[in-house]
Amino acid sequence: MDLHNIREDYSKRELSEADCADNPIEQFERWLDEAVRAEVNEPTAVNVAAVDGRGRPNSRMVLLKEVNSEGFVFFTNYHSRKGRSLELNPFAAMTFFWPELERQVRVEGRVGRLAEKLSDEYFESRPYQSRLGAWASAQSEVIPNKAVLVAKAAAVGLKHPLHVPRPPHWGGYIVIPDLIEFWQGRPSRLHDRIQYRLLDGGWIRERLSP
């Protein structure tokens, strides 16, 4: 399949240092708010990349559930491939892509588990069927067919018809950033790239060549 001619010239916006907040979390919140207001498809979807014990990278899309002064929060099964990778090598890279705005954001940092209380609170906010699924799915494990999964979810529902507690193998992670890069597409591939690096407890802002 020849894909050489699939290209687009970016021209919607530009990103100057004067446009950027001093703190990258504040800058991210600005861009995320603009993505939401622009009705970008799945604005909180983010690719999370991790590296397992053999040095093999793996990545997938998850949904960002919170951003705060500490970092970026998502939830998952701790026994999944990403969960096992993050336990062995507690660093991750995240990429947000908002093509409607010709923007992407890269985040790198150390990963830690959220406090159980916070995971409990979020789990309680999930729809009932989603809570059943968290118990039924041995995420990333091979299963013989979908019927097995459906039957397990039904069994959990019979056991917990009203209240589904959080499984001990399910909860939140926070990516505590030490690098955040903002990318804005520009004409002639002369894209704007503004990077923030954490150095001695403070953020350094610098422009990168595209």
From Swiss-Prot:
Catalytic activity: pyridoxamine 5'-phosphate + O2 + H2O = pyridoxal 5'-phosphate + H2O2 + NH4(+); pyridoxine 5'-phosphate + O2 = pyridoxal 5'-phosphate + H2O2
Binding site for FMN: 60-65, 75-76, 81-82, 104, 139-140, 183, 193
Keywords: Flavoprotein, FMN, Oxidoreductase, Pyridoxine biosynthesis
A UniProt-annotated Pfam family: PNPOx_N
Binding site for substrate: 7-10, 65, 122, 126, 130, 189-191
Physiological role: Catalyzes the oxidation of either pyridoxine 5'-phosphate (PNP) or pyridoxamine 5'-phosphate (PMP) into pyridoxal 5'-phosphate (PLP).
Family assignment from sequence similarity: Belongs to the pyridoxamine 5'-phosphate oxidase family.
Protein name per Swiss-Prot or TrEMBL: Pyridoxine/pyridoxamine 5'-phosphate oxidase
Organism: Neisseria gonorrhoeae (strain ATCC 700825 / FA 1090)
Lineage start: Bacteria, Pseudomonadati, Pseudomonadota, Betaproteobacteria, Neisseriales
Gene: pdxH
